[in-house]
């Protein structure tokens, strides 16, 4: 059963410009596993974190490091949760996540579907 759906889009150039203006922003938004990504891939990871938050109803107290978006063997995106995001997901009975990320023509997008 679908518990929540979230979607987000990011203007890649604006996002990267924000990271350039504030070098500490990369550390605040991304876990160490995500920080080496560049360009559209990094913007898509941010869009995924936003989409995950929206699928959960944008819980208060969420920290950006509460969700790590990585690739599993074969290339599909997967999410690892901790902290507030994990507590909210557990409280909603979420047992699986489906993510889709894309970036093209200067736009990065992500959709997150939470299921129980």
UniProtKB/Swiss-Prot annotation:
The organism of origin for this protein: Beutenbergia cavernae (strain ATCC BAA-8 / DSM 12333 / CCUG 43141 / JCM 11478 / NBRC 16432 / NCIMB 13614 / HKI 0122)
Cofactor(s) of this protein: Mg(2+)
Superkingdom: Bacteria
Protein name (database record): Holo-[acyl-carrier-protein] synthase
GO process terms (BP): fatty acid biosynthetic process
InterPro entries: 4-PPantetheinyl_Trfase_dom, 4-PPantetheinyl_Trfase_dom_sf, ACPS, Ppantetheine-prot_Trfase_dom
SUPFAM superfamilies: 4'-phosphopantetheinyl transferase
Positions of Mg(2+) binding: 8, 50
């Amino acid at each position: 059963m679908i518990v929540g759906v979230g979607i987000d889009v990011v203007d890649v150039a604006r996002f990267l410009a924000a990271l350039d203006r504030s070098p500490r922003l990369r550390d605040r938004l991304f876990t160490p596993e995500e920080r080496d990504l560049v360009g559209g891939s990094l913007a898509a990871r941010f869009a995924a974190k936003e989409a995950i938050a929206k699928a959960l109803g944008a819980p208060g107290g969420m920290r950006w490091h509460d969700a790590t978006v990585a690739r599993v063997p074969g290339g599909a995106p997967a999410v690892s949760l901790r902290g507030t995001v994990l507590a909210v997901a557990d409280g909603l009975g979420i047992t699986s996540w489906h993510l889709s990320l894309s970036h093209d023509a200067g736009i990065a997008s992500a959709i997150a579907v939470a299921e129980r």
